[in-house]
């Protein structure tokens, strides 16, 4: 029997465009906040890393809190869309604030400014926006194929935006005056673009009636499914082993991204050409986009996501090992590094495309085992993973830079820093890919759901 389809092509494209807005924040922040703070504002990378780590203490609580709020929201716009719409206004304001730290402030005040703006962006506004955006995958369609297609469109836009931002930002900062003024102007432009695209994405889809989502029109039954407090919500999540696997995988992916963002330092101080960072960004993002184009077809051909995810990430792990080998052979092997970087990205693509559908399957697993609808809360793993993983990754890079005696005033860094940059950019990404591959090999949620449905 063919599954009912709920979406037109323009609904999927409109939804996917929402990650343009998301990556105007995330890609810009993760790729450039450290080099902006160290080389323009003049802050210590170790202290910045510690402040980011401190900020992350709030994130786990706010993720579950906002996820639970979304599950309990009833409005004309639905459960998630209001949070996605209004949350981004705060994202835009705080993004500009982070890249507009006054250079004439005392250093203590600069650290405080950064901590407050960064915490508000991540723990409050980005959390509300991103969880709501991710939860829409399960709220606008019940068709698993459409959920994979939504994820593919979403991440095609995400990686295209990330590629564009990584390629043009440094040049744009210079063209707009350079220094603090250049960074501030670029941040304002990105924030305005994000605000417009996010609004378009919100109104491109419509949530299904709550009764249709739970296959009942009984209002009391729907309300009963939503009766749980914050502690119970946390227990539901922790009790779902597949949620924990996805959450850990998401965190590791974001730490991976933070290490790859060290390409700005690697290109500048090891390869001797900061513009090569943009070239490596192309080698990462173009293969990812190509993989996403074919992900829905491959999922359908292989009758599920499990086998595709494990095989493709195994390829990515092998390729990242070869990137490391090429990198340690010397700077003359940039061509080999680019080739293997592209192959690794191609292997990472399918998981990016079907990840939201896997999360929807995790939510169904909780419904089948606990009889609770926790779609919004379940998608907290996306926001938690992005913020905790990205923040922790950025913090680690700051600590490692400080420990290796990085000095932004030096054109040539000490050998200790050069060695550390190689470890961060070459070795750690390979190790993270290997761990993710192992976790994905245990991610058999589709099989578990089939057994549970058969037992009913």
Predicted feature locations:
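Membrane-embedded alpha-helical bundles of multi-pass transporters/translocases
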Residues: 2-456
């Amino acid at each position: 029997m063919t599954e009912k389809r709920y979406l037109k092509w323009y609904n999927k494209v409109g939804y996917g465009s929402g990650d343009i807005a998301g990556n105007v924040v995330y890609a810009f922040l993760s790729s450039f906040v450290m080099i902006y703070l160290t080389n323009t504002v003049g802050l210590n990378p170790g202290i910045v890393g510690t402040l980011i780590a401190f900020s992350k203490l709030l994130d786990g609580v706010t993720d579950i809190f906002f996820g639970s709020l979304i599950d309990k929201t009833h409005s004309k716009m639905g459960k998630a869309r209001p949070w996605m719409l209004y949350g981004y206004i705060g994202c835009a304001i705080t993004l500009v604030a982070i890249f507009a730290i006054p250079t004439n402030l005392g250093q203590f005040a600069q650290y405080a400014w950064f901590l407050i703006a960064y915490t508000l962006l991540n723990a409050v506004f980005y959390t509300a926006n991103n969880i709501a955006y991710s939860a829409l995958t399960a709220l606008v369609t019940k068709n698993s194929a459409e959920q994979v297609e939504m994820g593919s469109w979403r991440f095609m836009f995400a990686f295209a935006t990330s590629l564009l931002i990584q390629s043009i930002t440094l040049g744009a900062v210079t063209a707009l005056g350079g220094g603090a003024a250049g960074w501030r102007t670029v941040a304002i432009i990105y924030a305005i673009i994000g605000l417009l695209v996010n609004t378009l994405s919100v109104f491109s889809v419509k949530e299904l009636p709550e009764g249709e989502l739970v296959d009942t029109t009984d209002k009391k039954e729907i309300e009963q499914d939503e009766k749980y407090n914050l502690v119970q919500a946390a227990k539901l999540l922790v009790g779902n082993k597949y949620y924990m696997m996805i959450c850990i995988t998401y965190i590791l992916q974001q730490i991976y991204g933070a290490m790859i963002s060290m390409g700005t330092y690697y290109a500048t101080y090891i390869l001797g050409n900061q513009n090569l960072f943009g070239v490596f960004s192309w080698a990462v993002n173009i293969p990812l986009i190509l993989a996403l184009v074919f992900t829905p077809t491959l999922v359908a051909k292989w009758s599920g996501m499990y086998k595709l995810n494990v095989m493709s990430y195994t390829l990515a792990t092998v390729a990242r090992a070869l990137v490391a080998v090429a990198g340690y052979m010397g700077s003359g092997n940039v061509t080999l590094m680019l080739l293997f970087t592209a192959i690794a990205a191609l292997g990472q693509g399918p998981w990016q495309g079907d990840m939201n559908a896997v999360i929807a399957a995790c939510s169904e697993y909780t419904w089948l085992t606990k009889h609770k609808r926790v779609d919004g809360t379940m998608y907290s793993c996306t926001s938690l993973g992005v913020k905790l993983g990205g923040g922790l990754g950025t913090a680690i890079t700051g600590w490692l830079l400080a420990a290796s005696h990085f000095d932004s005033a030096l054109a040539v860094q000490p050998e200790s820093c050069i060695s550390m940059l190689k470890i961060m950019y070459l070795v750690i990404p390979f190790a993270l890919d290997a761990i993710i591959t192992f976790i994905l090999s245990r991610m058999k949620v589709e099989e578990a759901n089939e057994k549970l449905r058969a037992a009913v």
